[in-house]
């Protein structure tokens, strides 16, 4: 422990002495509380003398009842006078009458268990010994036959199963005959003497009994007899295991196993694998300082009584925690066993009782691992201690990582267009509840801010509470004052990324709904159809400062996943801005242009108004001299601080003048979408230029759409101070709402364009489908080929319809159509909606099990009969049925996808949560070579070179093709430089990457580069692991669940895409046989490609190393990616499909694996139009590929099969080389997301993810120390996380918060 909290945490196996040191007393009675007095029973499970008093400072008998007696122990009832909270931490213990094996060390999945590995006996044999089924040899004694010992130490004798017992019986009989022979020798084979000898007769009798398996006999007696004569000792139950573990010499065992591994001929057979696991286990226990016999318990701890309470229900009944039932059972059986031992009961009864005790303790620790778990009254298995740790409802996830918090509330959200960017409207009732303590403190305050005495509004707390309850008029000014003191934090579930939680300054509003600023809805993914949001209040000064400086909504301009503005206006606002920035010819010219375009342009000058100032132009609009969209002229001098390329008359509209007033005065004038902030000389009529000539050639400019507005905001963010952006956005929001109202855009069914051309296409396609059916019936086509061609034909028909409708809505006829305006501006709707409204609905998908084994090779997940009608025409009954079928499938898919995507995000976070920015520069000279990502199949660009290198650091100087320096090494590649590199024709660039950062923990600033959400160098302490996981997980729900056709002909592979493909890549799942690509294992040249008539596939023969050949047979209908004479490298695709990552690692190395995963992940996301920065994918991949497995330890002290991080391995190897010792060697490993978290090095973080029991067992066996490097382990222990403000001083955080607070407008 330190001032700042816990520094590290170690877990180990508890010794009996340690259990005793925790305990405050032994529990000997199974009673809990007295049914009359309801007080805890002495020596029972709730005994006050052991666990502490039930009431603060009051003993059991009532002799002492005040704080003044604190620390005394009552003479009568022996209860210490202290606070009752100690009942949450004080423990008791139970002295067991017989040793009991800990179930975690006997039953472990995946087996073998720790005890099984230490004693080198099978998992099943341990089980049989512990549960009193079979005996184990404790000492082989002096008992030989043919010069060999009959029994081996730790051999398990099976006398119960009819099949396996013959061998054990024969061994016992052999021993008995040995005894007979020995006695015969002693008595010189005299018959009389032998008959008289009791032991001889006994040996003969036992031999007869063992010969016939039907004769019952006492195993105990036989074994006691054998022990007396030969010294061979047998044992049963946990006692026997305890004795064997006690006598185990770990040093000897360690050396023995090591020798056996060295002598092993094959390093990969099962025997060697088991030896390696044994070596690992023995070394763990040896190095941990624990003793192996502690795995068998002689006493067990009793958890504090408050952690397993008894709760009284209505009607005088009680309910109790399941743990108490387990403890009761243990105590009853333990006490019964003690009594039996005291009365010398028969061995068979004692063994049975010991077995029952073993089972009782097992069910306490892990009830579900047993074949028949202990069940309650409702036949439900009771919750054991293991169940309390595991799963979503377990201790880790329910209580330690996520807690319910005070000072919070939730309500429905409605839109609040009148709010500023950083404000939220909170209902008055909510404020009274949430801010209650602060309001009361203000109401009873007796001094003002300057320390002067003042008359309080209320004399005491009670009166203040009454005033609040009555909602007295006097309290409202106080409430207004109080809510200015601290912001509130809003959260919308599901919180998929960090923008799901933001802070706002509260404003009191009427009603019961929270009013939310319309621009933050995108970040929260909120809409106003009944969504609810939770409100939290930061209490401490640090929390308030953090909320204002970091969490405040107005600082979240860019989305962290792609660095694009996330506060772009939507819907109504876009419609308003579109209307405002639209251009029209003056009204008379507009009418004339349809009849006589040439004359209209000449006449234009007579209606072209020129203004001297902005106010003059706006006044003319208000007086209705001109319309808001009419093209007008205004002198450039009317704009004081704006710079123009020349002086003259700017050709614009009143709408654009109003729009530009929202921006800072020095921001460029936005007039033309195509030329947002560059050279605007073509928009200005110069001093000596002809106005008539200019107007004759004038073409109307496009208005601003959602896309172009986003670019403007992006530019604004780049050139302005951070506090200017939210102010501007609020002005744009206000303009948007105002002018969407003025534009009076409405919608009606008659606005939808009419379109009849489709019936001709239908006629053609129907004829083609009929023809295909004939071909199928004649046997010219298979059913699969027919199906594929039909689906293809209808898809092409729909494409034609879509093309026609696009042409229609882009025509002049529909330019003022409200629905078209909505779609064009980006406010609502798209071409697909038009196609379905006016054209045809097209093909629908149907439910299909993608995992099924399919001989046809074609996935039939589309109904082949299309829906020909549009929604305006109305659907027929069968069309309506198919349509509903498809729509419902869409709904279920969405629900399934949300759950799967959420789980994937959780796995991603767990894998990367410890990755934090550490230090400025790790000094690495390695980087990754980055090229444009192209889809090699159709040669289209997936991600440009510019997108991949912007915001990163170069490794070496970069020169263009003329050898001119573009950028030096170790410098940041900005947007401008990235453009220069791309335009200069350079194909590849080496840049710094998180994949090669040599920081021991985390990543350095230079290997990461710019922070996408601020466009500045990433700050140290940023938790990029979590941000990366959220950036990849959050858009996961937008990915499809379908396995797409790659279209067209059968034989083209159906490759898993969308969400399933991402899962396949990150979890390292092998692709199915029918979609797996064959890759070359060697570097060489394609010698020949032969068609295989038997399999209908190909044989691809590759020549390598001058005259060696290797042949790759492909599956039927495989699509080849190479041709004869091509040069191939190891890891290159020979056929289409998905590569198995493990194969790629084997033949092409880890770098190729990393590049392949980046490329494939980007392919999936970008095909869906989702942009994610490469850097985030690299952070994830670095966590999946940063481990190596030791193949040869050298002199390092590591052992074969051990998995450690690359950076640790490098450090060990370097120190070995420096000291002239033999360094270790290792191979790279790729772990899927399921296994990566458990390899993190922190047992707390791993145990809170999955496999809690296994991870804690392993950690305890090796006395693992958790250095608390990641975020989760610190959250669990209640420390500040080692990231962000958790690394700064409190004063620094508060000062920064106050500074940012001043920037509010």
Swiss-Prot record:
Cofactor requirement: Mg(2+); Zn(2+)
InterPro entries linked to this entry: DNA-dir_RpoC_beta_prime, DNA-dir_RpoC_beta_prime_bact, RNA_pol_asu, RNA_pol_N, RNA_pol_Rpb1_1, RNA_pol_Rpb1_3, RNA_pol_Rpb1_3_sf, RNA_pol_Rpb1_4
Residues involved in Mg(2+) binding: 527, 529, 531
Binding site for Zn(2+) 1: 59, 61, 74, 77
Top-level taxon of the source organism: Bacteria
EC number: 2.7.7.6
Classification via HAMAP family: RNApol_bact_RpoC
Similarity annotation: Belongs to the RNA polymerase beta' chain family.
Subunit-level organization: The RNAP catalytic core consists of 2 alpha, 1 beta, 1 beta' and 1 omega subunit. When a sigma factor is associated with the core the holoenzyme is formed, which can initiate transcription.
Protein name as it appears in the record: DNA-directed RNA polymerase subunit beta'
Organism (species): Ureaplasma urealyticum serovar 10 (strain ATCC 33699 / Western)
Organism classification: Bacteria, Bacillati, Mycoplasmatota, Mycoplasmoidales, Mycoplasmoidaceae
Gene name tied to this protein: rpoC
């Amino acid at each position: 422990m330190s001032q700042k909290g816990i520094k590290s945490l170690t877990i180990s196996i508890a010794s009996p002495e340690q259990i005793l040191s925790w305990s405050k007393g032994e529990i000997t009675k199974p009673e809990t509380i007295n049914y009359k007095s309801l007080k805890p029973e002495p020596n029972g499970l709730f005994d006050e003398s052991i666990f502490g008093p039930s009431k603060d400072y009051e003993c059991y008998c009532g002799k002492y009842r005040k704080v003044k007696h604190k620390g005394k122990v009552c003479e009568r009832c022996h209860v210490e006078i202290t606070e009752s909270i100690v009942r949450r931490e004080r423990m008791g213990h139970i002295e067991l009458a017989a040793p009991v094996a800990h179930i975690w060390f006997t039953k472990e999945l995946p087996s073998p268990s720790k005890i099984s590995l230490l004693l080198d006996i099978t998992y099943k044999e341990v089980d049989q010994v512990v549960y009193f089924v079979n005996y184990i040899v404790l000492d082989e004694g002096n008992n030989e036959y043919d010069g060999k010992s009959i029994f081996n130490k730790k051999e398990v004798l099976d006398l119960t199963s009819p099949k396996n017992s013959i061998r054990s019986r024969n061994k016992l009989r052999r021993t008995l005959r040995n005894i007979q022979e020995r006695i015969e020798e002693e008595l010189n084979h005299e018959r009389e003497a032998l008959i008289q000898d009791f032991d001889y007769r006994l040996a003969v009798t036992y031999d007869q009994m063992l010969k016939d398996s039907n004769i019952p006999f006492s195993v105990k007696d036989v074994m006691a007899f054998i022990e007396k004569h030969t010294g061979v000792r047998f044992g049963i139950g946990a006692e026997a295991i305890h004795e064997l573990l006690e006598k185990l010499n770990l040093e000897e065992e360690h050396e023995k196993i090591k020798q056996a591994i060295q002598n092993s001929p094959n390093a990969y057979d099962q025997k060697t694998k088991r030896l390696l696991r044994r070596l690992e286990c023995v070394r763990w226990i040896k190095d941990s300082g624990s003793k192996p016999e502690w795995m068998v318990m002689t006493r067990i701890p009793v958890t504090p009584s408050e952690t397993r309470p008894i709760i009284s229900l209505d009607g005088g009944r009680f309910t109790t925690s399941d743990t108490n039932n387990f403890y009761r059972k243990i105590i009853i059986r333990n006490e019964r066993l003690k009594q039996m031992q005291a009365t010398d009961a028969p061995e068979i009864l004692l063994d049975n009782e010991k077995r029952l005790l073993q089972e009782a303790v097992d069910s306490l620790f892990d009830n579900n691992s047993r074949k028949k778990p202990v069940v309650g009254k409702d036949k439900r298995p009771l919750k054991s201690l293991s169940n309390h740790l595991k799963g979503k409802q377990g201790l880790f996830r329910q209580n330690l990582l996520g807690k319910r918090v005070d000072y919070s509330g939730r309500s429905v959200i409605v839109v609040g267009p009148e709010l500023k960017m950083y404000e939220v409207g909170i209902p008055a009732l909510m404020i009274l509840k949430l801010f209650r303590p602060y309001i009361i403190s203000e109401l009873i305050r007796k001094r003002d801010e300057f320390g002067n005495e003042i008359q309080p509004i209320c004399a005491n707390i009670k009166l203040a509470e009454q005033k609040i309850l009555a909602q007295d008029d006097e309290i409202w000014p106080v409430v207004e004052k109080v809510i200015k003191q601290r912001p509130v934090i809003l959260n919308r579930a599901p919180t998929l990324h960090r923008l799901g939680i933001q802070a706002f300054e509260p404003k009191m509003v009427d009603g019961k709904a929270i009013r939310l600023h319309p621009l933050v809805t995108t970040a929260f993914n909120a809409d106003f159809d009944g969504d609810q949001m939770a409100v939290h209040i930061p209490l401490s000064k640090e929390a308030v400062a953090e909320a204002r400086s970091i969490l405040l909504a107005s600082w979240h301009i860019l989305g962290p996943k792609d660095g694009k503005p996330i506060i772009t206006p939507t819907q109504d606002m876009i419609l308003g801005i579109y209307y405002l920035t639209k251009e029209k010819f003056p009204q008379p010219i507009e009418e004339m242009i349809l009849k006589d375009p040439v004359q209209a342009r000449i006449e234009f000058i007579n209606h072209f108004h020129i203004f001297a100032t902005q106010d003059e132009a706006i006044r003319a609009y208000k007086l209705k001299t001109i319309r808001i969209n009419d093209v007008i002229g205004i002198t450039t001098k009317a704009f004081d601080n704006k710079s123009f390329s020349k002086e003259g008359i700017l050709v614009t509209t009143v709408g654009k003048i109003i729009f530009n007033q929202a921006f800072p005065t020095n921001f460029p004038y936005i007039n033309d979408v195509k030329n947002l902030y560059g050279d605007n000389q073509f928009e200005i009529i110069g001093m000596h230029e002809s106005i008539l000539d200019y107007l004759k050639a004038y073409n109307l400019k496009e208005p601003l759409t959602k896309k172009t507005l986003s670019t403007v905001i992006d530019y604004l963010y780049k050139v302005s101070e951070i506090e200017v952006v939210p102010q501007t956005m609020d002005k744009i929001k206000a303009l948007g709402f105002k002018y969407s109202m003025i534009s009076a855009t409405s919608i009606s069914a008659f606005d939808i364009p009419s379109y009849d051309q489709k019936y001709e296409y239908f006629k053609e396609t129907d004829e083609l489908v009929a023809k295909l059916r004939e071909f199928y019936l004649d046997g010219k086509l298979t059913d699969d080929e027919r199906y594929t061609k039909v689906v293809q034909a209808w898809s092409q028909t729909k494409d034609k319809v879509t093309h026609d409708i696009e042409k229609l809505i882009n025509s002049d006829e529909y330019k003022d159509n409200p629905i078209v305006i909505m779609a064009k501006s980006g406010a609502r709707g798209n071409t697909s909606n038009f196609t379905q409204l006016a054209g045809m609905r097209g093909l629908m998908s149907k439910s299909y099990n993608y995992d099924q084994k399919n001989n046809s090779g074609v996935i039939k997940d589309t109904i082949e009969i299309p829906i020909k009608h549009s929604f305006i025409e109305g659907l027929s009954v069968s069309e309506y049925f198919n349509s509903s079928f498809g729509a419902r499938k869409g709904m279920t898919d969405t629900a399934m996808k949300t759950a799967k995507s959420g789980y994937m995000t959780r796995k991603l976070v767990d894998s990367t949560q410890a990755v934090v920015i550490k230090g400025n520069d790790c000094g690495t000279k390695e980087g990754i070579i980055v090229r444009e990502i192209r889809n090699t199949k159709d040669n289209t660009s997936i991600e440009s070179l510019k997108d991949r290198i912007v915001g990163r650091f170069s490794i070496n100087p970069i020169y263009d093709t003329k050898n001119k320096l573009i950028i030096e090494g170790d410098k940041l590649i900005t947007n401008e430089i990235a453009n220069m590199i791309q335009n200069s024709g350079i194909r590849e660039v080496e840049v710094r990457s998180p994949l090669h950062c040599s920081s021991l923990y985390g990543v350095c600033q230079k290997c990461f580069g710019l922070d996408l959400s601020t466009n500045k160098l990433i700050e140290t302490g940023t938790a990029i692991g979590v941000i990366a996981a959220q950036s990849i997980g959050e858009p996961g729900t937008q990915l499809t669940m379908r396995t797409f056709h790659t279209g067209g002909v059968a034989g083209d592979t159906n490759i898993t895409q969308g969400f399933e493909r991402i899962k396949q890549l990150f979890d390292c799942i092998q692709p199915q046989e029918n979609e797996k690509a064959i890759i070359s294992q060697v570097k060489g040249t394609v010698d020949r490609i032969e068609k295989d008539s038997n399999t209908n596939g190909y044989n691809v023969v590759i020549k390598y190393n001058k005259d060696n050949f290797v042949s790759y047979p492909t599956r039927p209908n495989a699509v080849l990616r190479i041709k004869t004479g091509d040069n191939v490298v190891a890891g290159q695709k020979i056929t289409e499909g998905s590569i198995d990552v493990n194969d790629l690692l084997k033949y092409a190395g880890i770098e190729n694996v990393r590049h392949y995963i980046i490329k494939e992940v980007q392919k999936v996301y970008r095909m869906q139009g989702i942009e994610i920065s490469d850097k985030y994918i690299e952070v994830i991949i670095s966590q999946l590929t940063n481990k190596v497995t030791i193949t040869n330890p050298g002199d390092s002290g590591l052992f074969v099969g051990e998995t450690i991080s690359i950076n640790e391995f490098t450090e060990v190897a370097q120190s070995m080389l420096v000291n002239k010792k033999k360094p270790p060697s290792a191979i790279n490993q790729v772990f899927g997301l399921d296994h990566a978290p458990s390899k993190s090095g922190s047992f707390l973080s791993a145990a809170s993810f999955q496999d809690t029991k296994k991870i804690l067992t392993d950690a305890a066996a090796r006395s693992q120390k958790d250095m608390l490097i990641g975020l989760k382990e610190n959250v669990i222990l209640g420390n500040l996380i080692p990231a962000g403000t958790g690394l700064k001083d409190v004063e620094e955080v508060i000062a920064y918060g106050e500074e940012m607070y001043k920037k509010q407008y």
